[in-house]
């Protein structure tokens, strides 16, 4: 009898404990993991539901982009205006629409957006889903489920894992920037770096930072990359190893392949930020973009030990 009473009391105590409320996303959208390891989603423009488009998910893009070379985007929008575009390696004036377009991913349509047109290769993708759409939500990227979870602004932080590292987001050149520690050649630096899921790179330090700290020539590059943003001849990156990358107070990643930029035009030539984290780094984490509270949560996933470059493990 005593045993029964004790169990009943324990059960009653458990019932009285406050439970962490589960936040429900407003939508869950599957993504395709491309051969380039970047994220691709299905997007619809201006109510054309019979014309599904393959878009690159890009936290490094301020706007939504249509690929003007894709036959699938023809006639979807009228490009009657123009804007100045800062790409990774150039600054150009490109066509844009009025701010009256409708963009939908999953069930969530956002109206009043501007679209810009960039002539990517026809078979690259149909467009780029940038921040003008994404910042209407808190956004969680889950690689295990291969899904993107959209939350009402302010609800995202409730979905953050207790194991995630939280980084404070700022904005430079219109894109999110976070503080990261990096050790190069035995010297520690605290850098502000862009967060760019649209980049297939790992971790590039911008030209002004490289010059200011005299980094060129301090290591022999293991490879040279010649990048092409929206122009064909985009400049050079010297690929080297960073001793380590430090995220927050809890996570240190040793021997990360990074790069010293020598690009002289565009984002990587800008001193507005010290460098850029690309998707080849970010894919190792489930990511939660709390746009309401300007925070990025990074949770290690099962892609942590995915090779950065195949040629490095052959």
Which residues does each PLM region occupy?
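Pepsin/retropepsin-fold aspartyl endopeptidases
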Residues: 21-314
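Bacterial N-terminal signal peptides
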Residues: 8-16
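Bacterial N-terminal signal peptides that target proteins for export
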Residues: 1-9
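Short, composition-biased linear "edge" segments at structural boundaries
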Residues: 2-3, 17-19
């Amino acid at each position: 009898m005593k045993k029964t009473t004790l169990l009943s009391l324990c059960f009653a105590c458990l019932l009285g404990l406050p439970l962490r409320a589960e936040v429900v996303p407003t939508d869950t959208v599957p993504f395709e993991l491309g051969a380039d390891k970047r994220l691709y989603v299905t997007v619809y423009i201006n109510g054309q539901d019979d014309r599904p488009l393959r878009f690159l998910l890009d936290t490094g893009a301020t706007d939504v982009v249509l690929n003007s070379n894709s036959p699938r985007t023809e006639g979807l929008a009228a490009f009657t205006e123009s804007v100045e575009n800062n790409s990774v390696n150039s600054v150009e004036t490109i066509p844009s629409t009025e701010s009256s377009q409708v963009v939908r991913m999953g069930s969530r349509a956002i109206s009043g957006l501007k679209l810009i047109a960039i002539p990517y290769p026809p078979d690259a993708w149909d467009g780029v889903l940038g921040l003008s759409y994404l910042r209407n939500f808190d956004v969680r990227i889950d690689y295990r489920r291969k899904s993107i979870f959209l939350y009402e602004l302010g609800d995202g932080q409730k979905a953050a894992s207790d194991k995630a590292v939280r980084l404070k987001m700022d904005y430079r050149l219109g894109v999110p920037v976070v503080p990261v520690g990096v050790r190069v050649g035995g010297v520690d630096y605290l850098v502000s770096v862009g967060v760019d899921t649209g980049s297939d790179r790992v971790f590039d330090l911008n030209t002004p930072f490289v010059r200011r700290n005299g980094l060129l020539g301090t290591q022999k590059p293991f490879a040279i990359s010649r990048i092409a943003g929206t122009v064909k001849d985009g400049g050079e990156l010297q690929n080297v190893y960073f001793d380590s990358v430090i995220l927050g107070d809890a996570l240190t990643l040793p021997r990360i392949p990074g790069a010293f930029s020598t690009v002289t035009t565009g984002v990587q030539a800008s001193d507005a930020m010290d460098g850029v984290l690309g998707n080849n780094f970010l894919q190792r984490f489930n990511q939660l973009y709390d746009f309401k509270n300007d925070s990025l949560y990074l949770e290690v996933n099962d892609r942590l030990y995915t090779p950065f470059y195949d040629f490095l493990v052959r």
